[in-house]
Swiss-Prot record:
Pfam families registered for this protein in UniProt: DUF4691 (PF15762)
Protein name: Uncharacterized protein C16orf86 homolog
Residue ranges with Low complexity bias: 64-73
Region listing for Disordered, in residue ranges: 40-156
Compositionally biased residues, Basic residues: 129-139
Taxonomic lineage: Eukaryota, Metazoa, Chordata, Craniata, Vertebrata
């Protein structure tokens, strides 16, 4: 390294001397002005003035010579620069593995050939993946046609009509609807009011008709017992209204008629007579209520004078 630096110093000095000599030997320009221009720049045309303003090139050339001398003192840097640029294929970073080193040593033609098989391999891997996916889809969708065939075969064996096949292939949601349809179509009496529905409506009317008859019979029994209790009591006689007297006298003949005529006509006569008696008793009750309501109303706090 030291010898290279020593050689560089005299070369720099010789270069500076040659440059000064060239500047001194420049021919005069046609414009009769001295020009300090390097030797390689000569006047091309006699009319043009190549000279710069002032004599400012002398110190610049001197500075260049000094810089060249200083650069000769750095042997390590100059030695690396003089050797020239090295081939890029030999420079390999340590971070890369042996595979990258081998690729750097190989020529570019082989690298391109290697990259092409890698791209084709990646394309083949993608195509194989797509092929596998297609196989999976086919395997998943394959059982569907046998199911249709198995569903259509029993319909043919059972002798069903072809339009019934969609009902067989339908889902659970459509299997529930025909049940209600069959119930409505096969049993139309459920949608109409039959005899069974009409009977309960007729029964309350008959019960309402029988209830007042029973109430009338009970009233008659009480009215018959009241005069007997009044007659047998110790001087306690209850006043009886006049319309009740003939009713008490008419009861024995009714009983005799029932005993004499045990047929269906006797029951009809008894029911007719009971209805007439009930009407009379209800009329008596109405008269009593009207008599009470017709009485003069008296304030509760005022004394009543007769």
């Amino acid at each position: 390294m030291a010898s290279a630096g020593a050689k560089r110093q005299p070369e720099a000095q010789n270069g500076a001397a040659v440059g000064l000599a060239q500047v001194a030997e420049i021919p005069e320009c046609p414009g009769t002005e001295e020009c300090l221009v390097p030797a390689h720049e000569t006047c091309s045309t006699p009319g043009e003035d190549r000279c710069p303003v002032g004599h400012s090139l002398e110190p610049e050339l001197q500075e260049e010579g000094i810089n060249l001398g200083e650069e000769g003192l750095n042997p390590g840097v100059e030695a690396g620069e003089e050797r020239g640029p090295k081939p890029t294929s030999s420079i390999v970073r340590p971070a890369h593995g042996p595979k990258r080193k081998a690729e750097a040593e190989l020529p570019p033609g082989l690298l391109l050939q290697k990259e092409e098989p890698e791209g084709s391999h990646s394309e083949s891997s993608l195509s194989s993946k797509q092929h596998k996916k297609a196989k999976k889809r086919k395997s998943v969708g394959a059982p569907v046609p046998p199911a249709v065939a198995s569903a259509s075969a029993p319909t043919e064996t059972l002798g069903l009509e072809p339009f019934a096949v969609p009902w067989v292939l339908a889902g659970k949601a459509q299997r529930l609807r025909p049940l209600y349809q069959y119930i409505n179509y096969c049993n139309p009496e459920l949608n109409q009011a039959g005899d069974g529905d009409r009977e309960p409506e007729a029964e309350p009317e008959s019960e309402l008709a029988l209830a007042p008859e029973e109430a009338g019979v009970e009233q008659l029994q009480l009215q018959t017992l009241l005069p007997m209790a009044g007659e047998l009591g110790l001087g306690l006689a209850l006043p009886c209204p006049n319309p009740l007297a003939p009713l008490t006298h008419n009861l024995p003949p009714l009983v005799e008629e029932v005993g004499e005529e045990p047929g269906g006509l006797s029951s009809l006569r008894v029911s007719g007579s009971l209805k007439a008696e009930v009407d009379k008793t209800t009329q008596v009750d109405i008269d009593k209520m009207l008599s009470v309501c017709a009485a003069p109303l008296v304030p509760p706090l005022s004394p009543q004078y007769k």
